Amino acid sequence: VSSNIGWTDETWNFLLGCERVTKGCDGCYAITTANIRKSNPNPKIATAYAGLVERNETGRLDWTGQIRVVEDRLHKPLTWRKPRRIFVNSMSDLFHADVPIGVIAEAFAVMALTPQHHYQLLTKRHARMRAVLRSARFAEMVLHWLRTTDQWLPAKVRVSAAQRAVAIKTLSDRAETEPMNPLPNAWIGVSVEDQATANLRIPALLDTPAAVRWISAEPLLGPVDLTAWMAPRTPADPADAPSTWHEWTWPDWVPADARQQIESFWSESIGRGPRRWLQNAHDNGAPAFGQEWTTHPSMRPAGSPADRHTGRYIHAWNNIGRLALPDGSMGYTSFTERHVRDQLGLHWVVVGGETGPGCRPMHPAWARSLRDQCRASAGTSFFYKQHGDWHPAPTQLVLNDPAWTLMLCGDTKESWTFQRGPRHHNELDGEVIEEYPVLLGAVR
């Protein structure tokens, strides 16, 4: 179904039904939508939504807890040839406990067979998301679906042998005991409404294999600090860096051995210097200077019994780096584009205020803070969806304006208004910000 959600093109609702889990669910639009659609004059639609919502003992409209798989929608993206961004299950949660793991695997097989699309998955069930996507058994289930397409695909859907072979290769380049390689076109995200849910869900997201990791902070109900999960920028842009090491100042945490090796390799005496060093880091897509970085097992420091070592990254040359280890010593590491992607942290942050009856205002300072955090990071894109039904009021009311209810927030310079109806209030400080994550190629 074509979508009016600003950050997607299409919704793929092969699951219906859900349950509230945190206060971000209090104004859930899907409950109201399901209640309307259960009375749709089209019997097919009415049947699909029947029994999903009811009024509880307090009179509140709520989910019944029933989860329904709509089988004839599961393969729909295979019929969409034009590339598009697809929001997976806006009317449910793919990782709800009652969604069969076989259905999740079948959905991932469909995603693997349609690399022209980008799939946007969003969940509040962070624990099951991590458990499923880190499971070697789940990887084998997805591969089974891919190897048996002739047994389950509808007759009208055509998948070429080459298309299937590419999908199988993408997912099978792994040891049998390892989780599935991330699908390059699957963006895995969690919902975050305040700092508590950020602290709860984001660590699980970062521990989940994903090509793109993102959060939806909508409705945003409080201030959120994401800097712990964002990569820092390099200390200077190459163009602004000094040309000699004499002018360069190393942070105290950089080990002396690392300084000596880097300054020797990038010596001005052979036409190099800090400017060339930073440009090399930029050209090779290196991790950010000072970013927390975990070594690949094959690159552990000499003499170390640990399979993996974590420290702060310092670029050396090409795809080679050094680590400032917690004890002050130097370690060795390297990277591929895939490793950078996996350790980058959050790639995308979507922010929006709440809409609908009883909606709660979003303070503009909360949104501004997230915007500024993204802009200060190395690679986290920011998408501002909307203020919500509470939004800045116009400076003047003129004849034939709609009715306004004005409220002056004591800690802002703006008057705010509550207005239901068409929503185009997507400017933050006069700017429309609709960034998408930088998509990295799949590196094996």
Range-by-range predicted roles:
Residues 104, 198, 367:
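Aromatic/hydrophobic pocket-lining residues that form the small-molecule binding cavity
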Residues 193-198, 363:
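Active-site glycine- and acidic-residue-rich loops that bind
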Residues 134-139, 206-210, 372:
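Short, surface-exposed basic-aromatic patches at helix termini and helix-loop junctions that form
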Residues 92, 125-127, 192-194, 219-221, ...:
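Active-site-proximal loop/turn and secondary-structure-junction residues that shape catalytic pockets
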Residues 85-87, 118-120, 185-189, 212-216, ...:
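Structural preference for beta-strand elements that scaffold enzyme active sites
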Residues 2-13, 37-40, 44, 173, ...:
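Auxiliary Fe-S-binding modules of radical SAM enzymes
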Residues 1-16, 20-22, 26-185, 195, ...:
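Conserved Radical SAM active-site core
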Residues 90-98, 186-190, 351-360:
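Surface-exposed cleft-lining segments at the edges of enzyme active sites
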